[in-house]
């Protein structure tokens, strides 16, 4: 939730032109799907949510190592020991800061009992996968037959609860289940990392220290409130928690007690509070009851691709006047103003997206993620697969290639206003400008063929 809820770029996310997604170095992508996020103008925020089985509170002890290997590992052990010594000094100072924000001494003692520096968390945080997967590969997994089948079972198993949630918050039960399916594979991968240890390690590390210290304070407030014991407060390495992966600040702002037991328990094997909290979160960000997230459309041959821009909104009737139709050839019903989205350029599937698309972006800003949630929810309602074709002969640009594309566009006079390897609105605008200047289809698609033209 831009929550992934509040800041999901904390997982280092960004979706290149809605085309490619960073490959996960953690959980199996088939089970838990969080793509790289699309950069935004001035936010480092997204959602909040996690994975894995809720069993291990502390990392398992290292296996014994042959004597010959012990000497080779000695420098690493010394580095870990040095890091932990500094970490413990940081914790001492942090506890003083935490107490000034209302965290009690008893909570601090319980939360930090036995907590040591976790080098594995920093390794994951530092990992920047060079290789990416295309949006069509991501969607193949997001709405795979097994995920649809398991989602249907989850809907049936929790139908009464989901119908009450839908009635109370006005958010489609299939949307809630689709988020659940992508975030933790319907609760199968909720995360087994110690949240306090992970957040403290990340806050101490300093790369995004202020953000993670804020999350750590929020996590301690959750413990202070009695919603969870620190030893069962588990989640992802980056601090996302529960069935639908809330980060601590988002939990404080949006989690709800839907069972009425006095706790907002998103960690329980019973997903009621987590699912209701997801609906509450989406409602808080303006979910429009009865409005689709988006609808697949067919564009006329004469379509002006410069109109496929998030800043350009028209009513479905106005789009129909321009020849835009549903895949069955009919005009789209009036669900409010909408934009046209081409996540893989003019040769891929096209979508008419409504306000609820932007609401889902509060969970994760990547186009692929939002389409994944939306399409999975449609499949859970009995809808069809995406009918449009994808340029499956293409491959996604690597991180290095994305930076090269930005560099070459900028040198050619089409500034991307930064070279970061993240294909966001400014880079897409530069791509469009270049395409228009060269007489190419101005669809904003950052492809390998475009890069080759720039070389």
PLM segments and residue spans:
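Sec-dependent N-terminal signal peptides
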Residues: 1-25
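Proline-rich, low-complexity linker regions of envelope-associated factors in Gram-negative bacteria
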Residues: 21-85, 106, 385-389
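Non-catalytic peripheral regions of nucleotide-handling enzymes
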Residues: 22-24, 405-408
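Acidic/histidine-rich, surface-exposed loop or edge segments in extracytoplasmic proteins
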Residues: 70-79, 91-94, 137-148
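Mature N-terminal segment immediately following signal peptide/propeptide cleavage
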Residues: 78-110, 114-117
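A general alpha-helix detector
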Residues: 90-94, 161, 198, 277, ...
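Catalytic glycan-binding domains that act on GlcNAc-containing polysaccharides
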Residues: 103-335, 348-351, 357-399, 421, ...
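Short acidic, glycine/serine/threonine-rich helix-capping segments at coil-helix boundaries
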Residues: 397-402, 410-454
């Amino acid at each position: 939730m831009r929550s992934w809820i509040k800041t999901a770029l904390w997982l280092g996310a960004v979706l290149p032109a809605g085309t490619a997604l960073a490959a996960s170095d953690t959980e199996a992508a088939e089970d838990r799907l969080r793509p790289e996020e699309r950069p935004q103008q001035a936010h480092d925020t997204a959602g909040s949510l996690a994975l894995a089985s809720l069993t291990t509170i502390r990392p398992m002890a290292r296996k014994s190592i042959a004597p010959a290997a012990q000497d080779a590992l000695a420098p690493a052990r010394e580095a870990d020991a040095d890091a932990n010594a500094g970490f413990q000094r940081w914790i001492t100072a942090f506890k003083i800061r935490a107490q000034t924000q209302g965290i009690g001494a008893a909570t601090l003692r319980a939360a930090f009992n036995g907590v040591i520096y976790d080098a594995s968390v920093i390794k994951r945080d530092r990992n920047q996968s060079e290789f990416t997967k295309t949006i069509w590969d991501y969607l193949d997994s997001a709405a795979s037959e097994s995920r649809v089948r398991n989602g249907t079972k989850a809907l049936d198993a929790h139908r009464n609860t989901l119908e009450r949630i839908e009635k109370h918050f006005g958010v489609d039960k299939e949307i809630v289940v689709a988020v659940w399916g992508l975030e933790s594979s319907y609760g199968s991968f909720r995360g087994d990392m110690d949240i306090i240890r992970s957040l403290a390690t990340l806050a101490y590390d300093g790369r995004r220290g202020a953000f993670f210290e804020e999350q750590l304070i929020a996590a301690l407030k959750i413990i202070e409130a009695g919603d969870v014991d620190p030893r069962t407060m588990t989640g992802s390495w980056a601090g996302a928690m529960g069935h639908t992966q809330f980060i601590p600040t988002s939990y404080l702002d949006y989690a709800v007690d839907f069972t009425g037991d006095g706790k907002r328990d998103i960690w329980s094997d019973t997903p009621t509070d987590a699912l209701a909290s997801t609906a509450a979160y989406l409602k808080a960000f303006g979910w429009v009851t009865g409005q689709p997230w988006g609808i697949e459309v067919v564009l006329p041959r004469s379509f002006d691709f410069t109109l496929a821009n998030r800043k350009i909104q028209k009513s479905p009737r106005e789009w129909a006047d321009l020849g835009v139709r549903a895949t069955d050839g009919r005009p789209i019903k009036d669900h409010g103003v909408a934009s046209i989205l081409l996540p893989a350029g003019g040769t891929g599937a096209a979508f008419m997206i409504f306000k609820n698309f932007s609401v889902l972006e509060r969970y994760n800003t990547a186009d692929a993620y939002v389409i994944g949630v939306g399409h999975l929810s449609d499949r859970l309602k009995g809808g069809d697969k995406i009918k449009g074709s994808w340029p499956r002969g293409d491959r996604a640009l690597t991180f290095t290639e994305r930076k090269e594309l930005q560099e070459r566009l900028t040198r050619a006079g089409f500034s991307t206003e930064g070279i970061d390897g993240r294909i966001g609105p400014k880079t897409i605008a530069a791509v469009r400008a270049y395409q228009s200047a060269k007489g190419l289809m101005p669809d904003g698609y950052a492809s390998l063929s475009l890069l080759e033209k720039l070389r």
